[in-house]
């Protein structure tokens, strides 16, 4: 599918789609399609996935200084990696002004792992995101087990694993939050 068709599809339906070098991946079917009709494996979609995404966005937003220029975005906002590559990360934080309707300069990207996306989030997306000059930190959040991994540009993208009782540090934002707060009252899948 040409990129123009993808952009029209993503802009004109209430479904959510990613565009990976010519391939369209459905993340959320449009409301006009029943789940039985949506025969492709969709990303996320579980209550656990949604709760973790919302919790992380809230913890980061609450931790930002009042005078911060950073804005926290949900997966509803499209991220442009290249002319033929658009994704919808679960949570994106950008600290620079963005064009209307599309993010291009993320500072932090968060993906909540699910069985359908984990391999892609840990490999292909990690590689693609690392190529973004503005990106400073990439987080992977477990939805089946308590797991938080942070990759940092300043650390040559080596993974840092956080555990229960730790304080998760997002140095690029000057934000920290308790590991345990991420999973509080959330039942894992």
Question: Over which residues does each language-model region extend?
Answer:
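Gly/Pro/Ser/Thr-rich low-complexity, intrinsically disordered segments predominantly at protein N-termini
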Residues: 1-189
């Amino acid at each position: 599918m040409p990129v123009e068709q993808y952009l029209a599809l993503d802009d004109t339906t209430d479904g959510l789609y990613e565009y990976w070098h010519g391939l369209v991946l459905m993340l959320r079917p449009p409301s006009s399609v029943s789940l039985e009709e949506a025969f492709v494996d969709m990303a996320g979609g579980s209550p656990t996935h949604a709760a973790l995404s919302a919790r992380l966005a809230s913890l980061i937003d609450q931790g930002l200084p009042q005078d911060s220029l950073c804005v926290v975005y949900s997966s509803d906002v499209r991220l442009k990696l290249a002319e033929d590559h658009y994704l919808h990360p679960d949570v994106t934080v950008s600290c620079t002004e963005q064009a209307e309707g599309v993010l291009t300069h993320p500072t932090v990207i968060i993906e909540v792992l699910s069985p359908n996306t984990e391999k892609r989030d840990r490999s292909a997306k990690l590689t693609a995101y690392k190529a973004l000059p503005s990106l400073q930190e990439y987080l992977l959040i477990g939805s089946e087990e308590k797991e938080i991994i942070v990759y940092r540009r300043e650390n040559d993208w080596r993974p840092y694993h956080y555990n229960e009782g730790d304080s998760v540090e997002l140095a690029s934002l000057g934000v920290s939050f308790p590991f345990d707060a991420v999973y509080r009252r959330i039942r894992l899948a």
